[in-house]
Amino acid sequence: MDNPMLLKSTTRHVRIFAGEIDRDGDLVPSQQVLTLDIDPDNEFNWNEDALQKVYRKFDELVEASSGADLTDYNLRRVGSDLEHYLRSLLQLGEISYNLSARVTNYSMGVPQVAIDDKQVS
């Protein structure tokens, strides 16, 4: 295959490309390497632990689909599952919205505010 097509999955917070970055910074299609871009618009505040959880989940999802053909559909399924995982991290408070982001649109739901029952009359 002289000019392979670049397969990709793009959601609001997850971009997966079937390819790798070369020395010139160009994305080169590949059937062997997946490149993951998490939260490209910096909508969330991240810590290293949360990022590592996402990378481990990504590896787990890719491993679970090993043996299947690398298709747009299969790649989008991994991306969609990873997007749902990010939502769960947000709901658990492991990541939070970045209020200094270019756009604050609460795409995964309005932030929850804890209410102290003792102060409610």
UniProtKB/Swiss-Prot annotation:
Membrane protein topology class: Peripheral membrane protein
Enzyme type, top EC level: translocase
Source organism, top-level taxon: Bacteria
UniProt entry tagged with the keyword Protein biosynthesis: no
Its job: NDH-1 shuttles electrons from an unknown electron donor, via FMN and iron-sulfur (Fe-S) centers, to quinones in the respiratory and/or the photosynthetic chain. The immediate electron acceptor for the enzyme in this species is believed to be plastoquinone. Couples the redox reaction to proton translocation, and thus conserves the redox energy in a proton gradient. Cyanobacterial NDH-1 also plays a role in inorganic carbon-concentration.
HAMAP family in the cross-refs: NDH1_NDH1M
Protein name as annotated: NAD(P)H-quinone oxidoreductase subunit M
Source organism: Nostoc punctiforme (strain ATCC 29133 / PCC 73102)
UniProt gene name: ndhM
